[in-house]
């Protein structure tokens, strides 16, 4: 894990932004100022991608997908490549995490080879367990309860259009699903308001 810690610090220095916390399992892991800082950084990256082309230089990122994906997989692979890193895909659709070997063993092995792990899973508990046993950053790219990357993208859209998130009121219409849960957390963190309109018995978790 020493190599990973060193690379993690180098990436933070290159970005000019501390990469904390260690894991991103849900938006609730981030406070408001950190979210705004990430959004500002994303705008800088979009404006001058060459400046960030080696932020992940020398790093290998594991991508674990228990569920089918087009946009998430493509954006992660292309994004990691454009930042100078190397992505390795593990397609787990036919053999879910923990079925062939324990999550403990999986995490202990991945931390020896990779600088970070991004996982798209059916059960959020798998991410919690993976983060417990894997001594490199774990990123939730979708679970049954949370979708933090989608919320950061949604908030970035509002932020880019000049909206002050703390003064914004977002309406969510649909099932109270993983996207809804994360957006609620995000709006609370930045000090905004949110109204959820869902079918009866299909609202967000309490």
What does each model-found stretch correspond to?
Residues 54-159:
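Phosphate/diphosphate ligand-binding glycine-rich loop within oxidoreductases
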Residues 27, 65, 119-120, 143, ...:
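Glycine- and other small-residue-rich loops at beta-strand/loop junctions that grip anionic moieties
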Residues 26-32, 58, 98-99, 140-141, ...:
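Generic structural "secondary-structure junction" signal
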Residues 66-78, 161-206:
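Glycine-rich phosphate/diphosphate-binding loop of Rossmann-like nucleotide-binding domains
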Residues 11-74, 78, 146:
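Positively charged, low-complexity intrinsically disordered leader regions
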Residues 5-7:
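N-terminal polybasic/positive-inside topogenic patches
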Residues 1-3:
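N-terminal acidic, proline/glycine-rich, low-complexity intrinsically disordered segments
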């Amino acid at each position: 894990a020493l190599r990973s810690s060193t690379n993690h610090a180098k990436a933070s220095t290159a970005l000019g932004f501390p990469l904390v916390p260690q894991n991103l399992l849900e938006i609730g892991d981030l406070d408001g100022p950190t979210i705004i800082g990430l959004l500002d950084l994303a705008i800088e990256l979009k404006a001058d991608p060459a400046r960030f082309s080696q932020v992940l230089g020398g790093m290998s990122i594991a991508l674990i997908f228990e569920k089918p994906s087009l946009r998430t997989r493509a954006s992660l692979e292309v994004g990691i490549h454009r930042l100078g890193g190397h992505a390795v895909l593990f397609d787990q659709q036919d053999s879910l995490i923990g079925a062939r070997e324990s999550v403990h063993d999986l995490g202990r092995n991945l931390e020896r080879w990779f600088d970070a792990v991004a996982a798209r899973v059916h059960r959020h508990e798998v991410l919690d367990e993976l983060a417990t046993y894997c001594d490199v950053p774990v990123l939730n790219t979708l679970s049954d309860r949370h979708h933090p990357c989608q919320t950061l993208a949604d908030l970035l859209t509002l932020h880019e259009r000049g909206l002050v998130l703390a003064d914004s009121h977002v309406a969510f219409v649909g099932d109270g699903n993983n996207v809804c849960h994360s957006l609620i957390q995000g709006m609370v963190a930045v000090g905004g308001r949110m109204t959820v309109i869902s079918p009866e018995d299909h609202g967000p978790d309490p």
